[in-house]
Regions:
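Surface-exposed, low-complexity loop segments enriched in small/polar and acidic residues
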Residues: 113, 218, 249-278, 295-446, ...
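N-terminal periplasmic accessory domains that precede
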Residues: 56-59, 63, 84-87, 101, ...
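Hydrophobic, lipid-facing positions within transmembrane beta-strands of outer-membrane proteins
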Residues: 84, 150, 180-184, 283-287, ...
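Short, acidic, small-residue-rich periplasmic hinge/interaction motif at the N-terminus
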Residues: 16-49, 93
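Short, polar/charged loop or turn motifs at beta-strand boundaries
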Residues: 38-61, 86-91, 117-122, 169-173, ...
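Extracytoplasmic beta-strand/coil segments of soluble accessory domains associated
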Residues: 32, 61-104
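Predominantly transmembrane beta-strands of Gram-negative outer membrane beta-barrel pores used
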Residues: 59, 97, 133-135, 151-157, ...
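Short acidic/polar hinge/loop motifs at secondary-structure boundaries
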Residues: 103-136
Length: 457
């Protein structure tokens, strides 16, 4: 995506007897904007250190204007685990614009669970942050609909001399979870340029849902492995031996042995395998080279979500309206039944859905002051890439197996009534995953000119 922004600002000064003390303009691209005035809030790097957050987006917890931000593990919804959004005024993620040194960063190619694109705040290294400017009012007149809720501008270090080392360790007091961080910043004068280099790394250990009381216990699905019989029937022998009446719900007789919860029907405890906090690795690099006329910067970030456990498979929702005929899927019944379950339930191990998220932001700006003209031209290119692996089953293979045409040999049957009868070969054959690489990128050219002629600025 390529955008060209040309900003021309003209104001007329009208002299009269009325004295105008001061006019403040906020939310513009003017490099001399007086952002200290309301409604702009400034959060300095020192404030970040004082609060003690592990990542930039976690500052949302301490902002009164922030509501609906996303910066923690979201196992239940979407595919954007490992990404972060800072949201203002309770609007959706796409309504708050995040800038880096007043320049745009690309929206992610991966949407939130609501289908919204947003700027992933995980690109910003704390070690290289000078301050964070928050424009808490809408700024659509300058930035467009991306800024309905407001603008957040991250200002990075441009001039630094010497070395800076940050060591950070945060841990939960009641559970075995911790974040361990390391940051390094180096700066010096180099051939009439200010050179700054930064590196940051964080390792985050997981926190399982079952470690916290009354979390995973509440996460129970009725779609474990149960059946609704669609007619009166009598089974003389076997696992389902008995007499059944039309409309009766029949749970898996081996529900508990198969890892389910028996409560009227055979339920699936999906919460016990999920994480509250995922196992993550964060790495960020920052480089800046600048002087009076040139400003070059590059930020690179990589976030790996190493585990992110998911259910063995998701519910077989099409079968809520599809009858299982006698003999299909190992059915012992003489009449059709309706299946309330999932191909891989509680007896099967949980599967991991790792993520590998990389993004970068490059900017070159040329600045020149003439006698009556101040000119800034800049080129910015950014990209966000998310490699995504979400496990499930291959529907076509599962359906073939239900009808006895499964496996490489094409003659194996999947038994939904007695999962213990399913061979390892057939289990592996129906397994699959949604594997994708989603990329978002943005290229912008900015031209900003300021001049004055007589009474016109």
């Amino acid at each position: 995506m390529i955008k060209l922004f040309l900003l021309i600002l003209i104001s007329f000064s009208i002299f009269s007897n009325e004295e105008i003390e001061e006019v403040i303009t906020t939310g513009t691209l003017l490099k001399e904007s007086e952002s200290k005035f309301s409604p702009v809030e400034i959060i300095t790097a020192e404030k970040f250190d004082e609060i003690g957050v592990s990542t930039i987006a976690e500052i949302s917890k301490y902002l009164s204007a922030s509501s609906g931000s996303h910066f923690q593990t979201n196992t239940m919804d979407g595919v954007d685990q490992g990404m972060s959004a800072i949201t203002l005024r309770g609007l959706d993620h796409a309504s708050t614009l995040l800038l880096i040194n007043s320049k745009r960063q690309t929206f992610t190619g991966t949407p939130s669970y609501n289908g919204e694109g947003y700027v992933d705040a995980n690109i910003i290294p704390k070690i290289a942050l000078t301050k964070m400017e928050i424009l808490k009012e809408g700024a659509t007149s300058v930035y467009g609909s991306d800024a309905v809720a407001g603008v957040i501008n991250f200002i990075t270090v441009k001039k630094f001399s010497g070395y800076k080392l940050d060591l950070d360790s945060q841990y939960s007091t009641n559970y075995n979870q911790n974040d361990i961080g390391f940051g390094f910043l180096f700066g010096k004068d180099f051939e009439n340029f200010d050179l700054v280099f930064g590196f940051e790394r964080m390792e985050r250990t997981p926190l399982k849902a079952y470690e916290i009381d009354q979390i995973s216990e509440l996460s129970v699905s009725g779609l474990g492995n149960s059946f609704k019989i669609l007619g009166d029937d009598v089974i003389e022998s076997g696992l389902y031996a008995g007499e059944y009446s039309n409309g009766q719900t029949i749970p898996d007789p081996n529900c508990i042995e198969n890892g389910g919860i028996l409560d009227g029907r055979c339920r699936f405890a999906y919460g016990r395998g999920f994480n509250i906090v995922n196992d993550e690795s964060h790495e960020k690099f920052y480089t800046s080279l600048s002087n009076r006329n040139h400003d070059i910067s590059l930020i690179f970030s990589n976030v790996k979500v190493n585990d992110n456990p998911q259910s063995p498979s998701y519910p077989a929702l099409p079968f809520l309206a599809r009858d299982i005929e006698p003999g299909v899927g190992g059915s012992p019944f003489n009449v059709p039944v309706r299946w309330y379950g999932r191909p891989l339930g509680g007896r099967y191990p949980w599967r991991e859905s790792p993520k590998d998220i990389s993004q970068y932001h490059f900017n070159y700006s040329f600045l020149k002051d003439f006698e009556n003209l101040s000119l800034e031209t800049s080129f910015t290119h950014s990209q966000h890439e998310n490699f995504h692996n979400r496990p499930d089953i291959v529907d076509s293979r599962f359906l073939s197996a239900l009808y006895g045409n499964g496996g490489e040999s094409g003659d194996l049957q999947w038994n939904i009534f007695d999962p213990s009868q399913n061979s390892i070969e057939l289990v592996e054959h129906i397994k699959g995953a949604e594997i994708s690489k989603k990329i978002g990128d943005l290229t912008t050219f900015d031209i900003l000119a300021q001049t004055s002629y007589r009474n016109i600025n």
